[in-house]
Regions:
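Shared catalytic-loop signature of beta/alpha-barrel
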Residues: 1-75
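C-terminal extensions of enzymes
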Residues: 64-106
Length: 106
């Protein structure tokens, strides 16, 4: 089952699909978005593969996450940091920012 959490209702719904797939002995994958898919697939025993694209095809995955897990021997080792574990590359964000909006508290 190649389910996409961004189109199917989010990570919780994706895990519900994964639970149903277990009942029918169906392997799970995730369509695109390796920054989220890697964590979802690591959370189940019947995950199969992670789609990972060339940096020109998926520049956000390859550039905006400063501590992006590196692919080695076909595997990713995820961080132990809270949540998705991302540390954003502020310089990359600044490079492509259109404007900087500052809201003052009154």
């Amino acid at each position: 089952c190649n389910c996409d959490s961004s189109w199917s209702g989010g990570p919780t719904e994706w895990r519900r699909v994964a639970a149903m797939a277990t009942v029918y002995d169906v392997k799970m994958a995730h369509h695109e978005e390796p920054q989220v898919a890697s964590h979802l697939l690591a959370s189940i025993p019947h995950g199969t593969y992670l789609e990972n694209f060339h940096p020109k095809r998926d520049p956000i995955w390859h550039n905006i996450i400063a501590n992006r897990p590196q692919l080695k021997d076909g595997n990713l080792t995820l961080t132990d940091n809270p949540g998705l574990g991302w540390e954003l590359d502020r310089d990359y964000i600044k490079k492509y920012r259109i404007s900087e909006r500052v809201t003052e508290a009154k």
